[in-house]
Amino acid sequence: MSIIDPQLLPRTAVVNDAGVLSIGGVTVAAMAEQFGTPLYVYDEEHLRNQCREAVSAFGKDRVIYATKAFLCGAMARLAHEEGLLLDVATGGELFAALHAGVPGERCVFHGNNKSVEELRTAITARVQHIVVDSFDELDRIETLHAEGLPAPRVQLRITPGVHVDTHDYVATGQDDSKFGFNLNNGDAMRAIQRAQASTAVELVGIHCHIGSNVLSVANFADACAVMVELFLSVDLPELTLGGGLGVAYTNGETAPSMSEWADVLKRATSAIPSEKKVFVEPGRSI
């Protein structure tokens, strides 16, 4: 019997009676012999199944893959082929996605403290939208627009004031987070009003990211309740619900399934009119 919990392994993983582990029909011993160690193995069938489960729940072009979880040309193409948009958080990640053949309009440009050159590259590439993190970033975009660049589609990152069950270093939704526009101190509404009045941006929505490797679906429900209330009050066409769905790393650790997470988000957004677009970010769970 394997001492490794099956939920820690890809869906195609098999441990035979001799204790030999295979992934996708190939033993890890054979892979180690061919490629050496340490060796990271990604199973394409497992990855595509994860993508398809998320897309089945939310629809094509509504699921955004966090490339910071893992990015190479093959992974970028796989996510794109399966109907996911790509979340890129640096100029380098955007370059890698574009170089892999992913169109700019299927990339969402994330990240805090984006440089002027990164913003210029994203606008020139006509990314799907830019997630604006601060008033300084609005300043930079307005400067680029004054230089003649087109007004990009933007979503504003809102800090909803929600604490999550994850490591403090990767929790990003609480009031003292350094990311986004704080809802409870009024910054969020000030940012929305400024963006709506600006000719330098096309404000299309709001976004939140409550943390990475979140293991409690209740945390997502709490954040959704706050964000949906705000979203309905400002009457914008798009809402993105972020904060990566967690995965188990050790024996005995449990994580919500993709379907459990999807059910919570779908219930929490049920009051949103059908003509509005809801995007989700499943994080490393893909």
Show which residues each predicted segment covers.
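Active-site-proximal beta-alpha loop/turn segments in soluble metabolic enzymes
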Residues: 76, 123, 161-180, 204-219, ...
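Active-site-proximal loop/turn and secondary-structure-junction residues that shape catalytic pockets
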Residues: 69-71, 92, 113-115, 134-136, ...
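C-terminal active-site-proximal or functional interface alpha/beta core segments in diverse enzymes
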Residues: 212-286
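Non-cysteine beta-strand/loop elements that form the S-adenosyl-L-methionine
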Residues: 87-92, 110-114, 151-171, 201-208, ...
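Rossmann-like NAD(P)H-binding beta-loop-alpha module
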Residues: 142-146, 151-152, 167-188
